[in-house]
């Protein structure tokens, strides 16, 4: 029927799902958890090392503190599910399935962080990032991470000024 094809740049699946997991933990919206459900239900995806690596990078550059995203208390999705999700997808997914996905993500993702991931995140918030712990040579140049480090430096200075 159509004789035209196009090529468009897209995110690598590790970047896509790494960022989706940050969004799912942060916003706790059914749309994000639907995508995480897809990741878990696709045999070649799941919490693959490259996906968790990308998650750590997106988490490192997120505007909220790392611990607030990674260990956020779960919120009810019932209202957003009814008002903003039902009818959005071709495949019907019930709220219970999305809540089970949320539970699984909260349980499994912290356990999937390697010692290198944990050490990198700690070094970042300590304002002494050890870039060698992550597989991306360009990480120190990402604007979101540079912004995060600038804000952490300002916070450290404010704290020191109040203290003494």
Identify the meaning behind each predicted range.
Residues 1-164:
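Structured mid-to-C-terminal alpha-helical surface segments
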């Amino acid at each position: 029927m159509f004789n035209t094809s196009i090529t468009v740049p897209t995110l690598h699946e590790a970047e896509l799902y790494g960022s989706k997991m940050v969004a799912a933990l942060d916003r706790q919206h059914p749309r994000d958890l639907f995508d995480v459900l897809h990741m878990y239900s696709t045999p070649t995806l799941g919490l693959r090392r490259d996906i968790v690596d990308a998650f750590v990078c997106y988490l490192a550059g997120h505007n909220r503190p790392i611990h607030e995203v990674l260990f956020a208390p779960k919120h009810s999705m019932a209202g957003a599910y009814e008002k903003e999700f039902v009818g959005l997808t071709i495949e019907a997914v019930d709220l219970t399935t999305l809540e089970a996905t949320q539970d699984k993500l909260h349980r499994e993702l912290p356990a999937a962080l390697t010692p290198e991931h944990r050490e990198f995140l700690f070094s970042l918030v300590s304002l002494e990032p050890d870039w060698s712990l992550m597989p991306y040579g360009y990480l120190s140049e990402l604007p979101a991470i540079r912004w995060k480090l600038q804000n952490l430096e300002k916070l450290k200075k404010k704290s020191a000024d109040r203290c003494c």
